[in-house]
Design a protein with these regions (language model features):
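Sec-dependent bacterial lipoprotein signal peptides
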Residues: 1-23
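Immediate post-signal-peptide N-terminus of mature secreted/exported proteins
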Residues: 19-66
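Long, amphipathic, charge-rich alpha-helical segments that form helical bundles/coiled-coils
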Residues: 71-119
Length: 151
């Protein structure tokens, strides 16, 4: 009976030791791709806001020279955010295969940091551009859903 209990405890210990509490590389990769999908929708808004701001700038409806400079700077920031996303997508390796799980995890964690920084930049520039558009009584664009996008 004593051997049976020891064997049962040993099996239970092995079972719990095999369970991971940290996400694996595939889970981190999936989260990176989910953020990418959200940023694709947000990127549409970045581009449309930039086009609207550019139209205001070219229309001559700018309230002052200071506003004109601020709007030009904001358009530049929107362009940079969009370019940063395009660069990240160009260099991102969806099918990355390292020598081991740790390399895979390190790669996808590094990509998570990069894509989160882009997300922060998108949030900042869309917030500011939405505010400027409201000042000119122009409705900002709502993001659309990517229902058919698959990885």
């Amino acid at each position: 009976m004593k051997k049976f209990i020891i064997i049962q405890l040993g099996l239970a210990l092995l079972f719990f030791a095999a369970c991971k509490t940290e996400p694996d590389a595939n889970a981190v990769k999936k989260e990176v791709l989910n953020i990418h999908d959200k940023l694709m929708m947000d990127g549409e808004k970045v581009v449309k806001n930039r086009i609207k701001l550019d139209s205001i700038l070219k229309s001559g409806k700018i309230k002052s020279a200071v506003d004109s400079l601020k709007m030009s700077t904001l358009i530049n920031q929107l362009n940079k955010a969009d370019e940063r996303m395009m660069d990240w997508m160009h260099f991102f390796k969806d099918d990355f295969k390292g020598k081991n799980e740790q390399e895979n995890m390190a790669y996808y964690k590094s990509q998570m940091i990069k894509v989160r920084a882009i997300e922060d930049q998108y949030i900042q520039v869309t917030k500011v551009s939405d505010s400027v558009l409201r000042n000119y009584n122009i409705k900002s664009v709502e993001t659309t859903e990517m229902k058919n996008h698959k990885h």
